[in-house]
Amino acid sequence: MVDYGALLVSQLEFYWDAHLRPRLDGLTDEEYLWEPVPDCWTVRPDGRGGFAYDGYQQHPQPAPFTTLAWRIVHVATAMSIRTSTFFTDSGDADMFDLRHWPASIPGNAADGIAFLQTCYRDWHDHIAALSPAELERPLGPKGGFFAKEPMAALIVHINREVMHHGGEIGVLRDLYRHRHRQAA
């Protein structure tokens, strides 16, 4: 019998260990906040001593270009919000409720990486502990309009988000590193 839970978790682990986490080594504050084009979405000072994440729950078309900071926070919050909703918060707020949003957003590279690592580890450890029956169970009211979808579908979605935005993080790091090179 196939252990689908182990497959989902090992997919995320492999991507994190072999691709995303190593690509974050050496990230500087300048690069974290680098805006390669005008009007990027990023993280910005919020005027209260913290930082805010541009565009939360907005879906403009076309989507704005986003910085490394935005992408790192987006990946981290995708995991942390679902961890809060389905594993650590005993309330009844669905996964789109702002009460699941992290208390603070990281404004520099070191804090951004630490935030992402913590969110990854928390999400990973909770999904790794799920039984086959828990993977098949519908999300219920906490899933909002995805209430009838199984937990496994949410894990597939979060894995896809981590890999999609993680790949973008890698490309942005390459662009930053080569931004001043001249054509031969």
PLM feature spans:
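Short, contiguous alpha-helical
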Residues: 3-102, 140-184
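Acidic/histidine-rich alpha-helical segments that form the ligand environment
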Residues: 100-136, 152-163
